Regions:
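Histidine-acidic metal/acid-base catalytic patches
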Residues: 2, 7-12, 22-28, 33, ...
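Active-site acidic/histidine proton-transfer and metal-coordination neighborhood
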Residues: 11, 16, 25, 42-43, ...
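Short, solvent-exposed loop/turn segments at secondary-structure boundaries
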Residues: 67-70, 98-104, 136-141, 203-206, ...
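N-terminal small/glycine-rich loop or linker at the start of catalytic domains
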Residues: 24-30, 88-96
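Glycine-rich, proline-tolerant flexible connector loops at the mouths of alpha/beta enzymes
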Residues: 58-76, 134
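Residue-level detector of anion-binding/catalytic polar loops
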Residues: 54-55, 85, 123, 160, ...
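Active-site-proximal loop/turn and secondary-structure-junction residues that shape catalytic pockets
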Residues: 35-37, 60-62, 92-95, 129-133, ...
Length: 299
């Protein structure tokens, strides 16, 4: 359900397009710049565009490197000249969700990132929950307040901010924990980022997807899990959708039932992807991921 404020602020054509997509359960394929990090900001986008990719996810790291010799306006022109739509940004700021001594500094850094990415035309921004600090049950009471503070900053820039649960996090590593915390915070500019790899390789179960309510997913990272001992899985071992053993069809159908109709952003870390030719990497991703999406009836 769209709010009155959203209706007034959103062009009718966009509202109609999204309504049709939600009703049909359709999603779009995107690629995260972490996947081609070795190529840099411009070359990653150029290669993907040549391969037919239309939706992209920007990283603060590659954008920062680009801005050492160019401008934010030029970064925007790279996107527009290639006909690319930026759907989300990795803000590159940690320490936002958990109680920690550097939280105030993290909020200041996050505000600067919001200004940067809002200027670039991004609608969404996210930060993972990764941390190795030790916590007690009492520490979880601070989470919702931290979320509200982050949400208020994002609101100033008309951004949706998302937390991505990380399988190795000592604070928020599972979907149920993140859902509970965001619901307690109840901030209108806050959503969850659902990562297929962190979900299936982490301490979650398929039934946890039933806990999601329509509208709670703000963005999705789309990968597969290799058929290796689970003890060997880490952040780098994720692979292209269709190459692994995760129940992607069932997971895609479930998030479609939850009315997600956004991008499925492929984020990979293996050197063969990050140091590979962005065009060839994107072409392989399309060849493998799009059939998976069609089989699940989300493309």
């Amino acid at each position: 359900m769209l709010s009155r404020r959203t209706l007034l602020a959103t062009p009718l054509a966009l509202i109609a397009t999204r309504a049709v997509a939600v009703a049909a359960g359709k999603m779009t394929l995107a690629i995260h710049q972490n996947t081609s990090s070795g190529a840099g900001y411009r070359k990653s986008l150029e290669g993907w565009s040549k391969a037919g990719i239309k939706h992209v996810e920007i990283t603060a790291a590659l954008l920062d490197d680009f801005l050492k010799t160019d401008t934010l306006a030029a970064a925007g022109r790279v996107l527009s000249d290639l006909g690319l739509t930026p759907v989300c940004a990795a803000c590159g700021v940690g320490g936002l969700w958990e109680p920690n001594p550097g939280h105030a500094a993290s909020l200041e850094a996050f505000k600067k990132r919001c200004e940067m990415f809002a200027t670039l035309g991004l609608p969404r921004i996210y930060s993972p929950t990764g941390t190795t600090l030790k916590f007690t049950e009492e520490d979880y009471k601070a989470g919702p307040d931290n979320i509200r503070q982050v949400g208020e900053i994002a609101k100033q820039f008309r951004l949706t901010v998302m937390a991505e649960f990380i399988r190795t996090s000592s604070y928020i590593s599972t979907l149920p924990t993140l859902l509970k915390m965001t619901r307690t915070a109840a901030h209108p500019n806050m959503a969850i980022l659902f990562d297929f790899y962190h979900f299936w390789s982490g301490n979650n179960k398929l039934e946890d997807l039933d806990l999601i309510r329509p509208g709670e997913i703000g963005h999705v990272h789309f990968q597969d899990v290799p058929d290796i001992p689970r003890e060997l899985l880490d952040s780098t071992t994720r692979i292209i959708p269709g190459d692994g053993i995760a129940p992607l069809n069932r997971m895609l159908r479930k998030i479609a039932e939850k009315e997600y109709a956004g991008s499925l952003s492929v984020e990979l870390f293996l050197p063969k992807f990050q140091q590979g030719d962005p065009f060839e990497v994107a072409r392989e991703i399309r060849q493998k991921a799009e059939p998976v999406m069609r089989q699940a009836r989300v493309l």
